[in-house]
Amino acid sequence: MPTIKQLIRNARQPIRNVTKSPALGGCPQRRGTCTRVYTITPKKPNSALRKVARVRLTSGFEITAYIPGIGHNSQEHSVVLVRGGRVKDLPGVRYHIVRGTLDAVGVKDRQQGRSKYGVKKPK
């Protein structure tokens, strides 16, 4: 516990909140161009080949973004929309690609939870 004299000399510093998605720069989403599309393996105890893309954002950042859903058409030079949101079992992946916008098409034959994968209501 500091003394009154110490507090007069040095005021208390407010706790700065650290953003979990710095590359978005306070925006809800950012547009970017895929520079590489590849798969990586999750950390223990999970096992899979998770689809990710290296994306150069309009803010100038180069980030790794997860491609959600089954199957995708993303390739190098695809223009994608990126939102925040980490993938718990992929270290360093703090962003998601938004399906159904720009060059990322929605998930094929999706019936439930369609809004998260950019799928229109079936006729």
Curated annotation (Swiss-Prot):
- Which keywords describe this protein according to UniProt? Chloroplast, Plastid, Ribonucleoprotein, Ribosomal protein, RNA-binding, rRNA-binding
Where it mainly occurs, coarsely classed, is plastid
- Disulfide-bonded cysteine pairs: these are none
GO: which molecular function terms?
Answer: rRNA binding; structural constituent of ribosome
Keyword flag Plastid = yes
Q: What family classification does the UniProt entry report for this protein?
A: Belongs to the universal ribosomal protein uS12 family.
Q: What does this protein do?
A: With S4 and S5 plays an important role in translational accuracy. Located at the interface of the 30S and 50S subunits.
Task: Please give the name of this protein.
Answer: Small ribosomal subunit protein uS12cz/uS12cy
What organism, scientifically named, is this protein from?
Gossypium hirsutum
